[in-house]
């Protein structure tokens, strides 16, 4: 079982938190376009649970091979793409048994292919 953080901010809850070189908080939702990331991103990034702040990913599972992700980068705001964010989203989705290890992550700036190897390495 993957530990989810007991955190709720408006319509977002139970994120998976990972560190893939920097901290990420990943929320799974039915439809990424319905989440007001411009408003919720800074609330999550600066939440007291994250003393070093956190990156935020809003993730929609399209299939076992595809995710759609929106990104709020700590210190930068909404960005069109984030490599470590795509890796964090892919790892979280696989840990929750929602996707395979080798998937495509669609971001506003384009699609990244992510492969999480059995040895723990993540290839982008």
Which residues does each predicted region cover?
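Conserved acetyl-CoA-binding loop-helix of GNAT-fold acetyltransferases
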Residues: 86-88
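Active-site proximal loop and beta-alpha junction motif in alpha/beta enzyme cores
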Residues: 1-81, 90-123
């Amino acid at each position: 079982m993957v530990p989810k953080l007991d955190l709720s901010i408006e319509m977002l809850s139970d994120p998976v938190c990972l560190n893939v070189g920097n901290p990420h908080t990943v929320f799974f939702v039915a439809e990424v376009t319905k989440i007001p990331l411009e408003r919720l991103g800074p609330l999550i990034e600066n939440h007291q649970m994250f003393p070093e702040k956190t990156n935020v990913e809003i993730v929609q599972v399209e299939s076992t091979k595809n995710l759609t992700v929106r990104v709020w980068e700590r210190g930068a705001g909404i960005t069109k793409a984030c490599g470590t964010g795509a890796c964090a989203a892919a790892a979280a989705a696989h840990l929750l048994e929602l996707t395979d290890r080798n998937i495509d992550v669609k971001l506003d700036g384009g699609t990244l292919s992510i492969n999480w190897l059995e040895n723990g390495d993540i290839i982008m």
